[in-house]
Amino acid sequence: MSTLSNFTQTLEDVFRRIFITYMDNWRQNTTAEQEALQAKVDAENFYYVILYLMVMIGMFSFIIVAILVSTVKSKRREHSNDPYHQYIVEDWQEKYKSQILNLEESKATIHENIGAAGFKMSP
């Protein structure tokens, strides 16, 4: 267990050194005002904030990837032999076949609105 805690501590130190070096090299050319502001920021120690953000973004990415993978896997499990799927496929096919076959039987019908019989249309 001590090797795991040492590994964790070592990993944290490595990340911290990398980010401190990056951030220090990033702000080489500064003015006096920027240096004064940087002294205030250095006093607040934001190094752990970057590590925290990396962990949170990593966890969020892991959750999103897990949701996408589970969705893809569930879509693959949907087979065409599924009874519900077959019912829908056959139902739509039969509906369209019956509509095509019954085209000769369809007749034009006129519906009259009896309530509107009192209104006269202008010529």
From Swiss-Prot:
Q: Name one Pfam family in it.
A: ISK_Channel
What domain of life does the native source organism fall in? Eukaryota
Subcellular localization is given as: Cell membrane; Apical cell membrane
Q: How does it sit in the membrane?
A: Single-pass type I membrane protein; Single-pass membrane protein
| Positions on the Cytoplasmic side per record topology | 70-123
Q: Which effect does the record note for changing residue 20 to N?
A: In LQT6; uncertain significance
A single BP term in Gene Ontology = negative regulation of delayed rectifier potassium channel activity
Transmembrane regions listed in the UniProt entry: 49-69
Illness: Long QT syndrome 6: A heart disorder characterized by a prolonged QT interval on the ECG and polymorphic ventricular arrhythmias. They cause syncope and sudden death in response to exercise or emotional stress, and can present with a sentinel event of sudden cardiac death in infancy.
Stated family: Belongs to the potassium channel KCNE family.
How is this protein named in the record? Potassium voltage-gated channel subfamily E member 2
Organism field: Homo sapiens
State the encoding gene: KCNE2
